[in-house]
Regions:
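Short helix-to-coil transition segments within interhelical loops
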Residues: 191-220, 407, 501, 507-528, ...
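Alpha-helical transmembrane segments of integral membrane proteins
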Residues: 15-23, 290-326
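Membrane-water interface segments at the C-terminal ends of transmembrane alpha-helices
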Residues: 26-60, 72-190, 219-240, 244-246, ...
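Juxtamembrane inter-helical linkers in multi-pass membrane proteins
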Residues: 63, 207, 298-315, 350-365
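Short, intrinsically disordered terminal tails adjacent to the first/last structured region
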Residues: 1-19
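Short cytosolic juxtamembrane segments of multi-pass membrane proteins
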Residues: 197, 299-311, 505, 514, ...
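Glycine-rich helix-loop "coupling/hinge" segments at transmembrane-helix boundaries
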Residues: 63-64, 141, 240-267, 354-359, ...
Length: 604
């Protein structure tokens, strides 16, 4: 049947034959500002670290020149290579311990009928939210040569059968405290699998342990590989544990070598510290990129599932008690011993052999804390940076996530890679780099302004620059460093909520004429408000336990518990460290309780 055709009307609205002009897309200034500020906050500190590493003296010295003297010095220093070797051993040992144990605990918690899983699950995540500095101190006062449990065991058997100061003990403790990181990824992968193959293995006579090692864990190998790279990378970030446990026998890793450079030379050796920092980033950055590659390639694996991914807990039977013994041993060594040691030490006047606990109970350590204004400020600042700073950080993370939301362009790819960069920078190094930002940028701007021969430049130099210099001594400096260090983590929390918003809701709003800004304000943000609340509580927990980022930013007005613990430990104030650690644990416990009460998914 013939079809009729109609001529295409190519006349424009003015009646001419020209087509209407295509309107050029408008530049989104809000998005541009978010991208600019994000890139400055990420790359400016890192640039200063690289710049300082290629100077022959600290950047504020007039005789500084470009050169490789800093790298020559550290490469000729035997302590650097000892720290590097120890760092490799620590990272490797950490992965060897944490990956199989984390996978095993995930299998027991997710795939079996292990009793008590409901209350055990949050307990497994405690080491993630307790500061490593606090954990290290907990092992000293509980299992050190004169620790509580060491003296009690010595009274029973006549000697202490362990040495927490040995490097092997440090590796074991670090491995055990990083098990939850592997557990999170392994349990998430196991929850997505059906149980048909496991049931078939059980029917054929396989024990629960054979099912775990031969069926379940091999099916989540991509997740275990990702977690393995993660904990290997985290091994190079370990600072607090080695600082506390490694000092008595002189064990160094790169982070503690960096921290002790000033003490070693007697003067602030910023160029040498920067060279060590560059070496650290050179190791960690490829690991972060490898993580990203593994995460993307993991999506290509197809897991064997039953119909509807049906899951049925495997009956442990007679193996139930063995499973509980493994789980109980990990909880005892990793959580109970160090934390109870801190609680006991914070309430006793002193401790040693032959001392009876009931005779030395006291509250004096807490009185001493509240008698010192700097420590009181540290507690208040820690709460403020967790509550208010955490909320502001989530707002910033949300703005960055919205700048990437459903926009598959070059800017999104730039941000996607940029937010991973801070993850490759250990907290100690990040704090140092921000210190240099607050020292260098005002001086650099002042030099530019003084070179301009006009009244406005001179006014800015005399009035604005002094205010800019004072930022270093404010809590804002610490908040900015914290927010950048935990950028990748915060982005993951917010992005998880954004991905749950169906695109059809936003498209419907756009179809009726709503602008992109109004869609965000009236549709997207209201739908993710509970996700943002959960993100705020999680960021609060992370900010409360953070310690290494504030070490180099510590000054009157910027005291926080984490940095004060490092300072007090260096000064030998064991009593104050114990009481302050107890306060820090209490704050984390309160935040954790609130998060659980509101149903926040801690596995995020």
């Amino acid at each position: 049947m013939p079809t009729s055709t109609m001529p295409l009307d190519t006349k424009g609205a003015d009646g001419t034959g020209s087509l209407p002009a295509v309107r050029a897309p408008r530049f989104n200034w809000t998005r541009g500002l978010v991208v600019l500020l994000t890139c400055v906050a990420i790359f400016l500190p890192l640039f200063l670290v690289f710049y300082q590493s290629f100077l022959t003296a600290p950047f504020f010295m007039p005789d500084k020149m470009l050169g490789l003297d800093a790298f020559r010095f550290i490469f000729d220093d035997p302590d650097f290579w000892l720290a590097f070797k120890n760092g490799m051993l620590l990272a490797s040992g950490l992965a060897v311990i944490a990956v199989p144990l984390g996978g095993m605990l995930a299998f027991l918690m997710v795939r079996t009928d292990l009793p008590g899983r409901g209350w055990i699950a949050p307990l497994l995540l405690v080491p993630i939210f307790v500061s490593p500095m606090v954990m290290g101190f907990g092992y000293v006062v509980s299992m050190g040569p004169v620790g509580f449990y060491s003296t009690w065991v010595k009274d029973l058997v006549g000697f202490v059968p362990w040495n927490v100061y040995s490097f092997a003990s440090i590796v074991v403790i670090a491995g055990l405290t990083h098990v939850p990181h592997v557990y999170l990824y392994a349990s998430s992968a196991l929850k997505s699998l059906g149980s048909d193959v496991e049931e078939a293995a059980r029917v054929s006579g396989a024990s629960p342990w054979q099912v775990m090692f031969n069926v379940s864990l091999p099916m989540i190998m991509p997740a275990l590989a990702y977690a393995g790279v993660l904990v290997f990378f985290l091994g190079f970030e370990v600072f607090g544990l080695v600082l506390v446990l490694g000092d008595p026998e002189g064990h160094l890793v790169l982070a503690t070598y960096l921290y002790k450079l000033t003490n070693k030379l007697g003067t602030p050796s910023y160029h040498l510290m920067a060279a060590v920092a560059v070496c650290l980033v050179a190791v960690t950055m490829p690991l972060v990129m490898l993580q990203r590659r593994l995460l993307k390639s993991a999506n290509k694996y197809v897991s064997i599932k039953g119909k509807g991914a049906r899951q049925k807990p495997l009956a442990l039977g007679k193996w139930k008690w063995a499973a509980l013994a493994v789980l109980g041993a990990w909880i005892l060594v990793t959580i109970v011993l160090p934390l109870t040691g801190i609680v006991l030490r914070s309430f006793v006047e002193y401790w040693g052999e032959g001392v009876k606990l009931a005779d030395v109970l006291t509250l004096q350590h807490f009185r001493d804390i509240f008698d010192q204004p700097s420590l009181v400020r540290g507690i208040v600042n820690t709460i403020l940076i967790g509550v208010i700073g955490g909320a502001l950080a989530v707002v910033c993370y949300t703005a960055i996530a919205l700048a990437m939301h459903r926009k598959a362009d070059g800017i999104t790819r730039l941000l996607d890679y940029s937010v991973l960069v801070p993850r490759a920078v250990p907290g100690l190094l990040a704090g140092l780099s921000f210190l240099w930002v607050f020292l260098f940028v005002p001086s650099w701007l002042d030099g530019i302004l003084r070179g301009m021969d006009n009244g406005l430049a001179m006014w800015l130099s005399e009035h604005a620059i002094p205010l800019l210099r004072q930022v270093r001594s404010t809590i804002f400096a610490l908040w900015l460093a914290y927010s950048v260090v935990w950028l990748a983590y915060g982005m993951r929390l917010v992005s998880t909520s954004l991905l749950q918003v169906g695109p059809e809701l936003e498209e419907a709003a756009r179809a009726v004429g709503a602008s992109r800004g109004r869609v965000t304000r009236d549709v997207t943000l209201p739908l993710i408000k509970f996700g943002m609340l959960g993100a705020w509580l999680m960021v609060f927990l992370i900010f409360e336990r953070e310690y290494s980022t504030g070490v180099y930013l510590l000054s009157p007005g910027t005291e926080v518990i984490g940095a004060m613990l490092v300072s007090l430990w260096a000064g030998g104030s064991t009593d104050l460290v114990a009481a302050l650690s107890f306060i820090n644990i209490t704050l984390v416990a309160i935040g954790l309780g609130i998060a659980l009460r509101f149903g926040v998914k801690l596995h995020n």
